[in-house]
Amino acid sequence: MRPPSAIHHERLPNGLTVLMVPRPGGVVTVDAWIGAGSAGETPELNGVSHFLEHMLFKGAGRYGPGEIDRVVEGVGGMMNAGTSHDFTHCYVTAASENFPVALDVIAAVIENAALDPDELVRERQVILEEYARKQDDPHGVLWETLYDRAFAAGPYKASVLGVPESLEAIGRAEMLDYYRRHYAPKNVALLIVGDTEPPRALEAVGAALGGFHRPFRPLVARDGAETTYSGPVETVLEKDVNETYGVMAFPVPALKDYAAAYALDVLQFLLGCGDASLLYQEIKEKRRLATSIQAGCGSSRYPDLFHVYYTCDEAKRPDLEKAALEQIDRVAQEPPAPQALERARRLLVNAHAFSLETTNGESASIGYYYTITGATRFERDYMGEIANVSAERVQEQAQRCLKPEAMTRVAVRPKRAGSRARRSSA
Amino acid sequence: MIDVRAHTLPNGCKILLRPTPDKAILSMVAAVRWGARDDPADQAGLSHLMARLLTKGTASRTAFEIAQTLESVGGDIEAFCGQDFLGLETQTVETDWRIALDVLTDCLFHPSFTAEEFDKERSLIQAEIRRAEDDKFSFTYRRLECLFYRGHLYGTPAEGEVETVASLDHESIRALHAAIARPESIVLVVVGNVPDEEFLAAIAMTWPAGPVRPAGPVRPAGSPPERDQAVRRRLEPEQAPGAGRGETVVLTKEVEQAFVVLGYPAERPGLPESAALRLACGVLGEGMSARLFSRLRDRDHLAYAVGSSLVGRELASHLFLYIGTNPATVEIARDRMRREAENLADEPPDDAELERARQYMLGRYLIGRQTNAALARSMATTEIWGLGWEWGEHFPERIKAVAADQVVSAARRYLTNPATAVLVPSPG
């Protein structure tokens, strides 16, 4: 696989980081990554990062409500935003000749969001609907319950979406204060990936955001030391679903130790990514205990979770969990076979390379890891480092992290008294 | 000028090679001119199950070996089956093209269809259907499609229903494969860099010589009108699409949020009004400044999710509108959405609104075609539809050529009397 392009890494005098990757293709993504996620919220303001993200495009600077949508879509641009535990990001992707429009909108949004009081009241209803929708979705319930139960305390226990009580209590004053504290040049990385020339792009960024000054004053001071886990713990919820959706999760350290993080990513692929992975073969193919199974690993600023996610017939859940633990134990007991290790490494390297195929994908990859680590090295070295992860390093992480005595299990199962969704015609 | 090399081999297979000089990713799509719509009425889901079994073992490889061979070079292979065609798709790095082609060929022409894999895959598909019904959108949309296309060849979901899949038999799978896995009914699209001569030589060496048989159950591969006639012969008059228009199916589930989907007929790709209707769909519900989003969500706060989409199908397309709303406002939301569709003809978009929709679509088009996989799928689809691989390349011109009065007339003709599926919380 070809190595990824070099990043043009710049910093404006006001502290704003600018990361540029020029590439052909006629498309450009302008993507602002802000270190503002649910991990930095107080319980009273739980959900404010995500609520604020919804408000960003509802008017900013010279753009009135609804105008950003019209302007961006009017030039064929696509905008979107996302919020998680550690970050908020918002981006515009457009044909490269519309780079000035994309930059102007993103600059307005990060410096001068209007947070219009009427829009805020209306958007709160939209978020409460999103909350309702999440309760209807077995995955939504599963992941929210997992993070709540797995952590006894710490930055990731609370939900990104917030809860109705906190959402009702967030008014304009609270949101504006949160915005001004976090949307500050030193806490923002601006990504420009696509068909642009870095010197000219940088000049445009300087013109748009050179006068942006605001101190970064995080609402909550954290060092990650406050994380404690509850495991071993098991929670089973009943819902109107046809299959069981379950997860088994284990504590993993924060993404500070790069070597450990690379090895954990390989472990994740070895165990549960791809049809030839250990869990897929043993649990789904050979023993037919799961109808789907995969592994994943959180690479985050603070200690997070490694998980095995599955769907199954409820009657098979106990055997499935037992068999999954046997596979996990095997990896902890003996280093992976060369063929299995090579498969995991190659698949992971290519998955990363393929994720960079779009401008959005590349800016998300660089932006995410920059926000977590404060540097571009982890992401740009990724493919080379993964190729060097040894069997011993993978085994070491399995021993260190995947301990049954620290495991959290959550399952969303069908209701006991036959509950298939009913159909009727009218 | 787009560099695509089209080859029709002596065995009848059509191969399209599209290099991407600045990228190392290789996407291949092998599309077989046969889809779920061709399943016998009492064997719904047969083609889908057959397609899924292609990667589950061949004469020389087990399911594990298929996965391991590709994954050990960081690639993958996946089967698909839609209403109009089925096939296989691979993704690898360009230097591994031989491995990808070898596995693809093996799966396409030499599947073993063992009893064990048949049994396993059948129950996995049933589980997938059950899970799809756990998702509000797929649950409601699946039922909408069945209602809208009732009596039509598209009247059953491609993967079948839990009950129809249960009754599928192993022997029918073998028979179907023998009938359709023939080079002359396959289009192979390759997006990425391969050495043309060597690639074609490898195919000539490993793919069956043909045409194997002239007729059989395979759909004729000729021009769209010829194929149309052939298909029409199989359609009874009452099988026109849209039999369920004007009707409503009400679904219940323990949910906090209601969901409504409206289905309208749409001109199929290639016909004169299809671009105008595509634009009507954009004005109505594509993007955050489209009517549905800006009015029903941003102005009236009736929804979290609302929008529209046009689903192209070879025989009969459809356009659908959807809204996720509070159960208390489900009737209002449904009426308002329906009125927005009907009002499009009476409240035509002005130049600015039309231009917004046009630009939005052109932007999405450009952004959506950034990956080799997306290009390969698009080329295979329009090639199978008989429109030629270039069809997708000319999307911008078609959209730019549509005038406001054409949008109005397309809306007047199509956007009335929808089929409706409503999901509401179950009582008690």
State the predicted function of each range.
Chain B
Residues 10-12, 244:
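Glycine-centered tight beta-turn/hairpin loop motif at sheet-sheet or coil-to-beta transitions
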Residues 12, 19-70, 272-284, 292-294:
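Active/ligand-binding-proximal structured segments within catalytic/core domains
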Residues 13, 195, 288-289, 296:
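A generic "binding-loop/recognition-motif" signal
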Residues 19-24, 29-34, 185, 213-290, ...:
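His/Glu-based metal-binding/catalytic segments typifying zinc-dependent metallopeptidases
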